[in-house]
From Swiss-Prot:
This protein's encoding gene: CTAGE15
InterPro entries to which the protein is assigned, alphabetical: cTAGE_MIA/OTOR
Organism whose genome encodes this protein: Homo sapiens
Protein name: cTAGE family member 15
Membrane topology: Single-pass membrane protein
Region feature (Disordered): 541-671, 721-742
Compositional bias annotation for Basic and acidic residues: 572-591, 662-671
Biological process (GO), any one: vesicle cargo loading
Transmembrane segments: 39-59
């Protein structure tokens, strides 16, 4: 006791030293007290670390306990679902047995129908021979008619050639007439164009003449208006000038009178001048200015008191003479101005007369032009009348020619229409004859095809009957081999029961060894399945509970009453009265001619199985085989399921069964006589076991060998099984789960094969032999 106690002391010392170093490395504010609560700091730290680890361990243990409880609940749920699936599988198997019974009845009916079909085929052959003779006669008659029609066709062809020649001549004449009509039409078009051009020119000329006439009338009216206006203006001016002339003449006369008076006065004054000269010398004293003189004269004239009368008179005369000179000068200026005005008036008068003469000459020229244009207009109108008459005559001539040509063309068209009617009749007759010939040829082809199809259909029926007979023979051989295999199964089950009674606790033995070592030719190598083991296994064992043994033992090893020995009878009962029709294939059978009857060994060898835990790929799904049916409750001993599920109770296999299976068995017994009655609910329920329902395979693992059974015809080894807790026939009780703490390595699963055989099963039954639809022509 000292040695184990001495070993932890250095470790504890090291731990305490490390703790002291850590505490010393802490700052003073972080350091704990030397004696917290009366304990040293090292013990406190150790206690804290130990408490932390204890908490972690407690959490880990609680997590494990909760997880184990959840796992137990999950296993219970899985067990419940597994039991439900097993019950559903049982129902499906019962329905499958009913379908198998119906198929057996259908095969019996088909065998009976074959005989009646042969009689009907013989009668049909006789009727076909009679119809062939009739058709040959009708064929000869049709050939004669074809010869006659060929002669008629030759005659019609000769007539058709003559009509073609006539049509060619008529077409040539029509073309010539069409050319002539085209030339005439072109001439008519040209004449129409010329007429249109003449009409356009005439219209233009008429428009120009109208415009010229309108302009001439407008010019004449404007000329008249201008002439009248100018004449009125000139008349007014002449009247004014005449008035001025009269006034001027009056003024001239008055001026002449004034001049005469002045001249007389001048003469008198000239007579008084010498007298005035003498007096002038006296008056020349004051010669400074004439104005002063006049002022003095005026003053003296005004005063007049101191002067003499003669002087006054002389002065007055001088003054009056000066005034007269001034007035005369002014009158001469006015006279000159009036003379100038009169000369200007004469000039304007002369200009007006000249302008009037020019207007008169223009008027004469315009009148002459108007007369010329009127004469030209008359000439053009005469030309228009002549041209219109000429064109009307040409149009009448062309119209007469066109009417003649149209009448001729109408006659030719009538002739052509008659010829075309004849041609159409001839072509219709040709088409009718051709249609008749084609119809006759089609009838001949139809008759030939009809008889060929009938011959082919009879050949197919014969071939199908031969294949059906061949498949029936093979099914018989399969049934015989299945009977032998069932006997072997009985021996295997007896061995299993004996081993279970002797050693019920041998559960540690591998499950795969039983499925592999119980083959009739020895164990198969790893990764390869032998055809013998496949022949002894049932496809229904995958869906059943693990290690469930079949209560159906047809013709088995001396237990209970066996079924009848007729190999054609698929309904074989065992010691419990349950039906069984497990049909297994012969692995050594030769392949047939058709694809659906090939050897299952060759097909199964080509199959590739995936590793355990993986599903089949889409391209590698195992094919299904038709003509293979299994009973409701047939089970073999070589099946197994994963070891997480419960194994069935073998002690109570002959005892308790669920009420559902008993009721289904009673229904199956009651329906044995009603094989031909279809069940509408079967197709929908059978979809669960269709081609898409494929369980994942398990890898075969070879285990230890089991004890040898020397009683059967083959050397067998059977595994000892421990007695599981009580349960039903199709599974263990839901509350039971196998222990998990077995000593040694985990158990390998049993070697399993696919639930379905390697051949493909079609989704419908094979048609009855001899039933073919009538060929429709």
């Amino acid at each position: 006791m000292e040695e184990p106690g001495a070993t932890p002391q250095p470790y504890l010392g090291l731990v305490l030293e490390e703790l002291r170093r850590v505490v010393a490395a802490l700052p003073e504010s972080m350091r704990p007290d030397e004696n917290p609560y009366g304990f040293p700091s090292e013990l406190v730290v150790c206690a804290a670390v130990i408490g932390f680890f204890v908490v972690l361990l407690f959490l880990w243990r609680s997590f494990r306990s909760v997880r184990s409880r959840l796992y137990v609940g999950r296993e219970q749920k899985l067990g419940a679902t597994l039991s439900g699936l097993i019950e559903e599988k049982c129902k499906l198997l019962e329905k499958f047995s009913l379908i198998q019974k119906e198929y057996e009845g259908y095969e019996v009916e088909s065998s009976l129908e074959d005989a009646s079909f042969e009689k009907a085929a013989a009668e049909e052959a006789r009727s076909l021979e009679a119809t062939c003779e009739k058709l040959n006669r009708s064929n000869s008659e049709l050939e004669d008619e074809i010869l006659c029609l060929e002669k008629d066709l030759k005659e019609e062809k000769s007539k058709h050639s003559q009509q073609d020649e006539l049509m060619a001549d008529i077409s040539k004449s029509i073309q010539s007439l069409e050319d002539e009509s085209k030339s005439l039409k072109s001439q008519i078009a040209e004449a129409k164009i010329i007429c249109k051009t003449f009409k356009m020119s005439e219209e233009r000329r008429a428009i120009a003449i109208k415009d010229a006439l309108n302009e001439n009338s407008q010019l004449q009216t404007s000329h008249k208006q201008l002439f009248q206006q100018e004449a009125e203006v000139w008349k007014g001016q002449v009247s004014e000038l005449n008035k001025q002339k009269i006034t001027f003449e009056d003024s001239k006369v008055h001026a002449e009178q004034v001049l005469n008076d002045k001249e007389n006065h001048i003469k008198t004054l000239t007579g008084h001048l010498p007298m005035m000269k003498d007096q002038a010398a006296v008056l020349e004293e004051d010669t400074t200015d004439d104005d002063n003189l006049e002022l003095e004269v005026n003053s003296q004239w005004e005063n007049g008191a101191n002067l003499d009368d003669p002087l006054k008179g002389a002065l007055k005369k001088l003054i009056h003479a000066a005034k007269l000179n001034v007035s005369l000068k002014s009158l001469e200026g006015e006279r000159n101005h009036i003379i100038i005005q009169l000369s200007e008036v004469d000039k304007t008068k002369e200009e007006l007369t000249e302008h009037i003469k020019n207007l008169q000459t223009q008027q004469a020229s315009l009148q002459s032009e108007n007369i010329y244009f009127e004469s030209e207009n008359q000439k053009l109108q005469q030309k228009l009348k002549i041209m219109t008459e000429f064109y009307q005559e040409n149009e009448m001539k062309l119209y007469r020619k066109l009417t003649v040509e149209e009448n001729y063309r109408i006659e030719e068209e009538e002739k052509l229409s008659r010829v075309e009617e004849k041609l159409s009749r001839a072509t219709e007759q040709l088409e009718t004859y051709r249609k008749l010939a084609k119809d006759l040829e089609e009838e001949l082809e139809r008759t030939v095809h009809f008889y060929q199809k009938q011959v082919i259909s009879y050949e197919k029926r014969g071939h199908d009957n031969w294949l059906a007979a061949r498949t029936a023979e093979r099914n018989l051989s399969d049934l015989r081999k299945e009977n032998a295999h069932n006997k072997q199964k009985l021996t295997e089950t007896e061995l299993k029961f004996e081993l279970l009674e002797k050693d019920p606790n041998a559960l540690d033995v591998s499950n795969t060894a039983f499925g592999r070592e119980h083959a009739p030719n020895g164990p198969a190598p790893l990764g390869q399945r032998s055809s013998e083991t496949r022949a002894f296994l049932s496809p229904q064992t995958l869906l059943e509970d693990p290690l469930g043994l079949s209560p159906v033992l047809p013709e088995g090893g001396g237990r209970g009453p066996r079924g009848p020995g007729n190999p054609l009878d698929h309904q074989i009962t065992n010691e419990r009265g349950e039906p069984s029709c497990d049909r297994l294939t012969d692995p050594h059978r030769a392949p047939s001619d058709t694809g659906s009857l090939s050897s299952p060994v060759e097909q199964d060898c080509k199959m590739m199985f995936p590793p355990p835990g993986q599903s089949y790929p889409d391209s590698a799904l195992p094919p299904q085989r038709e003509d293979r049916f299994y009973s409701n409750s047939e089970r073999l001993s070589g099946s197994a399921e994963p070891r997480s599920f419960k194994m069935t109770s073998l002690d109570k296999m002959d005892g308790s069964m669920p009420s559902e299976m008993e009721s289904s068995r009673n229904d199956a017994k009651d329906d044995l006589g009603n094989l031909n009655v279809p069940d509408s609910s079967l197709p929908a329920e059978n979809e669960a076991t269709g081609p898409g329902f494929i369980p994942p395979p398990l890898a075969p693992v070879r285990g230890p060998l089991f004890p040898v059974d020397t009683r059967g015809p083959f050397m067998r080894r059977g595994p000892p099984f421990p007695p599981p807790p009580p349960g039903t026939m199709f599974g263990a009780s839901r509350g039971y789960f196998p222990p998990r703490d077995f000593p040694g390595p985990p158990h390998a699963p049993f070697a399993m094969r696919n639930i379905y055989p390697p051949r493909g099963l079609p989704p419908y039954f094979h048609p009855r032999p001899g039933f073919y639809p009538n060929p429709a022509f």
